[in-house]
């Protein structure tokens, strides 16, 4: 049987830089992962209770497909007779697995998300520790895991010899180089996993593990491939030396020639440590005396930035770009590279040298307290997240008096420009209903991740069309986390500042100054209405009864003409059901009463047709005579152009605690 081989991820020697968060070529390295001996990928170092991840930069379309993977790897334990925890080959919906834990969680899951069906993660684990809580069979096994660490199939490490059919045991912690073969037949719905010594070039006919199951429901349309590993109180070094992916059911012969020998685990040398310590102390005293004057001047000059960022950078910092890299990428921050500007600063388009990756660079000053606050808010929230519907923060830079944030470039701009463009410029294509409906679902999915799926709750506090960006495929990504706040699950946020954009601020936020996930839902409801109607919340030039978008939609609903609220270009009969659903759901989300609004999980279920709106929804809305904008701010907005407002922050005189 012949197969068309698609070498999407070549046979690699993973040559990567060593840092907390770095990328090179096809793979992104995070946490303890770095380049090791001879350029091999080293997933961990000698740090205890740590983990490393290495994921390919480009997703692979393996849903509804057959595929074959081959990995050459080796494990070097700290102690010859006792393992650490293990490593895994991972299929992930995102590039990287944020919030993962070390030890028994293998750098894949954590205590909160382990076992959740929404993970969409499949892992082939090479486990060198028996964890009773996950039902491990022993401390030297291979397992197939779906969405959690309890294996759906597992077997002790080894292989079946083709000559005599006998099972030959292998020790994962033998420091020997081994090969792992992962082959899935979409036609037969069967996953085969084979482990064998690296010196055997042809895989045995009988697999170590076979799972008869359709894997398509667990994969998204595009899946990221990667490796994870973790250590506990005992260390181990995990090497990935070669890796190949081929389309189809293929069991290739793989002759490595001379099998490399992995170096032993580093031994502690107390004498050497004492000598180094003595030299370092001497040099430190001398350097401190010589550099004290220069250091004092530098400290005074940059005190503000260092005081706020130093601790955070050490613990959680994403990739830090040099100013030279960004200067070259944006062609010296020239005017023709400028994408936009406002109170936050300027945004420039650029291209990273040595690659074809387009980026957007936001430049702002750290002189103002607000500029520094928003800079830190972005890094501490979206800098730690990876989700297909969130704008990806690639890194940051501090140079002189300026702060820089680097994002993926979104070629189709912001949603508000697309909505405005479709009304004012007949030469531009209008958004189709299919595009609008997908945009709404994409933003809802992003908010669900922020509110309910991540380890901590993130309240965005500035949901509006201008902060929804569209990539080359018109997929929506939520951005601008400058006002975002995060807090632990189960705890209420407390704040004395009202932040957001006029018109999108929930009524209770003006009264209490307390931003919650429900205030995000309120703003999202208004965004849904704008997307369907193709207009702003306030239209001064419209007829009096049409000036306020929410009031106008409600009046049309009451008169049985709700469908007429949709923009004319999408007002086709086949779209009626979905359009009216979104309009009603938007009004429900933008309800004045906080407790009536659904959470984002319920919103997505309704959008996906899993749940339905209540039959008496109009009565619920009528009861409060819903108005989309508080009266205190409505008068201001009717007299001013909404475009003239950026993100505003008001100070409240009191704080309300509790719900």
Swiss-Prot record:
It is a single-pass type I membrane protein. Residues 1-25 form the signal peptide. One of its GO terms (molecular function) is protein serine/threonine kinase activity. Disruption phenotype: Increased susceptibility to the oomycetes Phytophthora brassicae and Phytophthora capsici and to the bacteria Pseudomonas syringae, characterized by stronger necrotic symptoms. SMART domains: S_TKc (SM00220). ATP binds at residues 339-347, 362. The chain crosses the membrane at residues 276-296. Its EC number is 2.7.11.1. Residues 297-659 are cytoplasmic. One of its GO terms (cellular component) is plasma membrane. It holds the Pfam family Lectin_legB. Residues 22-244 are annotated as: Legume-lectin like. Residues 26-275 are extracellular. The keyword Plastid does not apply. CDD domains: lectin_legume_LecRK_Arcelin_ConA, STKc_IRAK. Residues 333-595 form the Protein kinase domain. In the C-terminal section; belongs to the protein kinase superfamily. Ser/Thr protein kinase family. In the N-terminal section; belongs to the leguminous lectin family. Involved in resistance response to the pathogenic oomycetes Phytophthora infestans and Phytophthora capsici and to the pathogenic bacteria Pseudomonas syringae. This is L-type lectin-domain containing receptor kinase V.7. It comes from Arabidopsis thaliana (Mouse-ear cress).
């Amino acid at each position: 049987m012949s197969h068309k081989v698609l070498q999407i991820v070549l046979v690699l020697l993973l040559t990567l830089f060593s840092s907390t968060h770095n990328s090179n070529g096809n793979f992104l390295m995070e946490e303890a992962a770095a380049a090791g001996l001879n350029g091999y990928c080293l997933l961990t170092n000698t740090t205890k209770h740590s983990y490393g991840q290495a994921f390919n930069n480009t997703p692979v379309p393996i849903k509804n497909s057959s595929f074959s993977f081959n990995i050459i790897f080796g494990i070097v334990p700290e102690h010859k007779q006792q393992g650490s925890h293990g490593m895994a080959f991972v299929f992930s919906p995102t590039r990287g697995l944020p919030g993962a834990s070390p030890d028994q969680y293998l750098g894949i899951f954590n205590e909160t998300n382990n076992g959740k069906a929404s993970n969409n993660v499949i892992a082939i684990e090479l486990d060198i520790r028996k964890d009773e809580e996950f039902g491990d069979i022993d401390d030297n096994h291979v397992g197939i895991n779906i969405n959690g660490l309890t294996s759906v199939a597992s077997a002790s490490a080894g292989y079946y010899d083709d000559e005599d059919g006998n099972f030959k045991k292998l020790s994962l912690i033998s420091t020997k180089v081994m090969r792992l073969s992962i082959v899935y037949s979409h036609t037969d719905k069967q996953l085969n996993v084979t482990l064998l010594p690296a010196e055997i070039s042809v895989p045995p006919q009988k697999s170590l593990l076979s799972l008869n199951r359709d894997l398509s429901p667990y994969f998204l349309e595009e899946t990221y491939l990667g490796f994870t590993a973790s250590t506990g109180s005992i260390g181990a070094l995990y090497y990935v030396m070669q890796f190949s992916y081929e389309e189809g059911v293929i069991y290739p012969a793989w002759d490595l020639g001379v099998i490399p020998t992995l170096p032993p685990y580093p031994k502690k040398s107390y004498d050497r440590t004492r000598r180094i310590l003595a030299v370092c102390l001497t040099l430190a005293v001398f350097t401190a005396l010589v550099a004290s004057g220069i250091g004092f001047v530098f400290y005074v000059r940059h005190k503000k930035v260092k005081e706020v960022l130093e601790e955070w950078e050490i613990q959680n910092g994403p990739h830090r770009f040099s100013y030279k890299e960004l200067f070259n990428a944006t062609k010296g921050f020239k005017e023709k590279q400028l994408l936009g500007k406002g109170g936050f600063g300027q945004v420039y388009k650029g291209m990273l040298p040595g690659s074809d990756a387009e980026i957007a660079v936001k430049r702002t000053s750290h002189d103002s307290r607000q500029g520094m606050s928003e800079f830190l808010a972005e890094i501490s929230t979206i800098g730690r997240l990876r989700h297909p519907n969130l704008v990806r923060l690639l890194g940051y830079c501090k140079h002189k008096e300026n702060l820089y944030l680097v994002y993926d470039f979104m070629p189709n701009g912001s949603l508000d420009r697309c909505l405005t463009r479709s009304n004012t410029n007949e030469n531009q294509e209008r958004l189709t209903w299919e595009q609008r409906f997908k945009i709404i679902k994409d933003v809802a999915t992003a908010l669900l991740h922020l509110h309910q799926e991540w380890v901590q709750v993130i309240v965005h506090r500035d949901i509006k069309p201008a902060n929804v960006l569209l990539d080359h495929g018109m997929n929506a990504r939520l951005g601008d986390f400058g006002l975002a706040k995060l807090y632990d699950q189960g705890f209420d946020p407390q704040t004395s500042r009202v932040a957001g954009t006029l018109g999108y601020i929930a009524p209770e936020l003006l009264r209490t100054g307390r931003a919650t996930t429900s205030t995000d839902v309120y703003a999202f409801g208004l965004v849904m209405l704008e997307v369907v109607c193709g207009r702003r919340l306030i239209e001064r030039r419209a007829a009096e009864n049409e000036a306020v978008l929410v009031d106008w939609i409600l009046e049309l609903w009451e008169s049985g003409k709700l469908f007429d609220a949709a923009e004319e270009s999408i007002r086709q009969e086949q779209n009626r059901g979905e359009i009216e659903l979104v309009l009603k759901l938007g009004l429900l989300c933008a309800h004045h009463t906080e407790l009536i609004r659904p959470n984002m999980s319920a919103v997505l279920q309704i959008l996906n047709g899993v749940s339905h709106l209540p039959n008496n929804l109009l009565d619920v809305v009528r009861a409060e005579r819903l108005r989309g904008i508080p009266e205190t701010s409505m008068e201001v907005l009717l007299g001013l152009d909404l475009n003239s407002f950026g993100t505003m922050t008001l100070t409240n005189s009191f704080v309300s605690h509790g719900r």
